[in-house]
Design a protein with these regions (language model features):
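Membrane-proximal envelope and lipid/glycan-remodeling enzymes
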Residues: 1-388
């Protein structure tokens, strides 16, 4: 990638598969497949609530009586709605329509997004300057040392949103480093928004740079903004049909079973009061001791990113002076703002899963700074990330 974000995109072909690429792709497929099989064996097969909602959608309504009394459900005059985004439901529709693989759909859907996201980590690393074996190390970190693996194998519609967003943001960043077609960039951000609305904030810095660098600025802005506008309108309609307001996502009025989450929500769904606890979960939360085997356990609300994915620290190697690095840092920071203002934190998780909203930008920074690697320290951090 050219260090100047305003420079014209390169027409030079970047991605040519070689033996190492194929072996990496095969390794990802095997690891993710085996991990999913273990998850299925350990958790057994259950019908996901998102699959139930998909069946209701095919019947012409958004509510489902079976949702009553479950977490993140909204009761509107005796009709029960699941307070999740549209892209957490839509992939279930084919399974609901054909009535096949009930209970397995959630695992297969997560893999369908998670595996390609892991595969694309390699071209992402190369697009932002990683060369030779270093690109494979970075790709291995993304595939096995980030929370992408965790979110891809447990068959959970909450985690699915992160896989969807991670994949589309990865494609977005690769496209930005290459041809920078406004319609493609806008489409990727639009899809990411439908999965994780927080990620739409990345459109601000990238959109400004795109418009600034183009002679056809108005046309570029329209091509970038149209798919984003359609996605926002669709999400608003989706909320209005369920809750009577395009701005009501349901999380402010949904049913909660955990008193601590209810107490946090009382402070505001988005509030500065949430920042200290979210920072603690994201950066400082440590394993807790047990008096018996395995002697350590983790807080179900989160675990420090510095323990789970310490290789993200190498994003600092990119520095802050390079204009490309500045753009990526700004995007990551903007996306992180609502993450740390939000009350939820992400219950029943390993690590701090909301960090996946801005992780793709940090991965690009890791690759951008890879020319400054010493060697073993960075590989050690990646090894710890994978092992954790």
């Amino acid at each position: 990638m050219k260090s100047d974000p305003a420079a014209a995109p390169s027409a030079e072909p970047r991605y040519r598969l070689n033996r190492g690429d194929l072996l990496f792709g095969l390794a990802v497929l095997v690891v993710y497949g085996v991990a999913t099989a273990i998850a299925i064996f350990g958790r057994h097969v259950i019908v996901d609530r998102a699959e139930t909602v998909a069946e209701s959608l095919l019947a012409g309504h958004f509510d489902a009586a079976s949702l009553k009394g479950t977490v993140d459900t909204v009761d509107i005059n005796g009709h029960y709605y699941l307070a999740v985004g549209p892209l957490q439901i839509i992939p279930y529709l084919p399974f609901a329509y054909f009535h096949v693989l009930r209970g397995l759909a959630s695992y297969l859907i997560a893999l369908a997004f998670g595996v390609p996201a892991a595969w694309l980590a390699l071209p992402l690393a190369r697009a932002y300057g990683a060369r030779g074996k270093t690109a494979y190390w970075i790709a291995a970190f993304v595939a096995g040392g980030s929370l992408l693996l965790y979110c891809s194998v447990f068959g959970n519609f909450y985690l699915l949103a992160h896989c969807e967003s991670f994949l589309t943001l990865t494609v977005f960043l690769i496209e930005w480093a290459d041809r920078r077609r406004p319609a493609v960039l806008g489409s990727m951000l639009a899809i990411s928004f439908l999965a994780r609305p927080t990620t739409i904030l990345a459109a601000i810095p990238f959109g400004l740079v795109l418009v600034w660098q183009r002679r056809d600025a108005v046309l570029a802005a329209l091509q970038l903004g149209l798919p984003i506008g359609i996605a926002i309108a669709f999400y608003g309609w989706y909320n209005w049909v369920r809750f009577g307001s395009p701005l009501e996502t349901g999380y402010a009025i949904s049913y909660l079973t955990d008193p601590s989450l209810e107490a946090r929500r009382q402070l505001g769904v988005f509030s500065l009061s949430q920042v200290p606890e979210n920072l603690r979960l994201a950066l400082l939360a440590l394993p807790e001791g047990l008096g018996h085997f395995p002697y350590l356990t983790v807080d179900r609300f989160g675990l420090s990113m510095l323990l789970v994915s310490p290789a993200l620290l190498t994003s600092l190697w990119a520095g802050f002076r390079d204009r490309a690095a500045q753009l990526l840092w700004i995007a990551a920071a903007l996306v992180a703002v609502p993450v740390f203002l939000y009350y939820g934190g992400g219950a029943d998780q390993y690590g701090f899963r909301y960090s996946l909203d801005f992780t793709p930008f940090l991965v690009a920074l890791v690759a951008l700074g890879s020319s400054r690697w010493k060697g073993w320290p960075e590989r050690l951090l990646i090894g710890i990330s994978v092992a954790s």
